[in-house]
Structures are given as structure tokens and as C-alpha cells.
Amino acid sequence: MRFLFLHPNFPAQFWKISQALAANPRNEIVFLTAREDGSIAGVRKVLYKTAREVAAQTHPYLKTYEQAILHGQAAYRAMLEEKKRGFYPDVIYGHSGWGTTLFLRDLFPRARFLVNFEWFYNARGADSDFDPEDLPTADDEARLRIRNSSILVDLYSCDAGSCPTKWQHRQFPSEFHSKIEVLHEGIDTAYFKPAEPDAPLVLGKNGLNLSELPEIVTYATRGMEPYRGFPQFIEAVHRLLAARPNCHVVIAGEDRVAYGAALPDGKTYKQELLARFPLDPKRVHFTGLLPYADYLRLLQASHAHVYLTRPFVLSWSVLEAMSAGCLVVASRTAPVEEVLEHEHNGLLVDFFDVEALTATMNRALDERSALTGLREKARQTIQVHYELRDCLKRRVAWMNRQMK
């Protein structure tokens, strides 16, 4: 069979499924993307480039929609050339929201059209109005409604959709629920596993030897931002280090905003927070983005791993931490509660309660031996519900059903 995957950021959510399908020599796998670097054995990349940037005069509500249309237009043009060369997919599987999915149904009308749906924007009841000090304005509400435009086109156009979690599935309009199946991408538990006894845990990127640190709190994020509880975490770390002279904190991620709004004065949240809550650079280690092997060592060395999120998309990182046997201290928010139960396989705190977060990190460090069972149950949760092999089987079976 011929499969066409669509995502501007290769390989993104389609890494493992495209890799698995490419292992079958009877399949032909094409991946349309805007990202030049990276490769997967047996997967042929086709590149596209948008014709221009979003116009400065475009109405603010329409900027994300215009951006999606530009991606969709470029995707169509790139695949038109492939069609002229004889490529016609049996299955198209794209990620909604970016725009690459918008027009290819028209170019390949006989193909089964599958879409991965990650998030539907709502001004009420999820992330947007979660912070009482940062409620959406009328402009925000209007912008969010229009931001769903390209997603709604995909919901209408697709033959079937997938969504990684039940929480994320609930964000979509109820009339489309039957069209979307909950299918997580899966976690490689054979890779994300606890360290062997006495294994050296050195971050190759900067030579930091985690094996030598007596107490380690870890935090991993794409961006240092309010959506992932970075302000609460830094304030809690400020308090924690004052009480624990032997504690070290290792923070992986970039000093940028991945989700939500940046500060209006041009400062990063890291800059602002470190000015308010100074931290000892000898005990707080900002590693930047880590290579996969170093990221695994970070999780394996952790004595307490903190994951905070607004009611938004659930990060792979918390599932990877659970698979690696981390003692996870996380926010008591809906996406987290789908995978973590307080005192069963992790410890939950109120997202905004810095005092409770500090106390829970203290407890995690004080009671490391007593809380070993939570680590074991966290890994078991991933093995039972999110094991990569099982998730791939379910996804392939779902894709096969769409061909009937």
C-alpha cells in the first residue's frame, strides 16, 4: 500500500507509525514536510515551502488561518508534482491545524483521508480561562473561535480521525466525537526504563555527572512558560533550595514560549523569574534541549520529576518519565489525572499552590525509599496502557478498518 504522511515538522507524531509501516517491503511511505533534516529508513521525504509569510495587514483573527492556507497551498503544489510522476496514495494521514491537510483530499479523492486531531480551542472550560488572573478577552474569544477554522475543515473532510487522549478528545464538538478514535502514539518502554544499578549517568552535552548528586529534582519542557507551570516551579525551587543545601535541580528545555503568550516587554519568563527568585547556578542546572540519550539519563537520575500543565495537551514527557520509573510530582489537572492517580502512581498538587508543590517535592526527597511503589506503579501504568508495540498495533488495525 501507499501511505502519505503530512506534518511540517518531520517526523513529529508520525515517527513510529511511519517507521513501522516502512518495515513492510510491500508498503511505499512518503512523508510531506517542510523540515529538511532528519530521515527514517524506508521513508521518502517530499519537501514543500510556503510561498510567503502571513501578510502584515491580515486581520489578527485570521493570521493562523492564513498561515494554514499557505501551508495547504504549498503542500498541494508539492504533491501535484508527485502525482504527475505517478504517485497516488491509498491512505493520507495528516496532522490537523497546520494546514497541510486542507486541500489534498481534492488532489487525491480516491485516497482514504485520515487526520490526527490534537486540540480544539475553547474559550471556556479548558486552558484559556484556567488562570483567574489571565482570563480571555473578547478579542481572545473571537480569535480562538476562528483559529478552529482549519481544524473544522479537517473534521468535515476526513474519513476518520485519531486523538491521543480522552481529555483531548472531549475538547472537540460532540457531533464529531464518533468520527475520532482515541489512539495514543505510544511510549517505548524498552528504551524509557529505569537505569541499571551503578550505571554512570553523565550528560554528554555538558559533562554534568548526575550520579554524584545526592538529591535531584528534574523538570523537562519544550518551553519555559506559564502553560507548563514554569513560574510556580521556579518559585517552589527557590524555597526548596533554601531548605535543602544538598539538593540540585536539573531543568531541560529551551528559554522560549512554546504555548501561550510571550511577555510584552520582550523578556523571557526565565529572565523575569530568576530576577525575582534568584537560584544558585552551582545547584540549578539549565541544560537546554538534550539529545535523546542524555534526556533518558536525566529521567533515570531523577529523585523527583515535576510536571505541571494547564488543562491542555498532555506531554509525552510525563509518560516517558513514568516509563523510566520516575517519582512524578504533577499538577492535579484533567489531562494529568487521566494517567496519574494521587498516592497510587504519583503525587498530585494544585497547579497554583506553590507551597504545596514545595512540600510535595520535600516529601518526595525525604521519603524516597517509602515511595518506591509509586515509581513501580507509574512504569506499570505505561506498560499496560501506553506500550509502543500495543499502541502501534491498535493504530495499524484502525487504519486497516478505514480501508474496508
Where are these regions (language model features)?
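Carbohydrate-associated surface elements
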Residues: 167, 186
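Conserved acidic donor-binding segment of nucleotide-sugar-dependent glycosyltransferases
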Residues: 342-343, 347-354, 363-368
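Nucleotide-activated donor-binding/catalytic signature segment of Leloir-type glycosyltransferases, i.e.
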Residues: 256-257, 262-289, 293
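Acceptor-binding helix/loop patch of EC 2.4 sugar-transfer enzymes
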Residues: 52-62, 110-149, 190-201, 211-212, ...
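Acidic donor-binding loop of glycosyltransferase active sites
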Residues: 159, 297-313, 326
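Conserved donor-binding/catalytic core segment of Leloir-type glycosyltransferases
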Residues: 162, 203-228, 234-239, 249-250
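A short, well-ordered alpha-helix in the C-terminal region of glycosyltransferases
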Residues: 356, 363, 370-385, 391-397
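N-terminal subdomain of nucleotide-sugar transferases
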Residues: 1-44
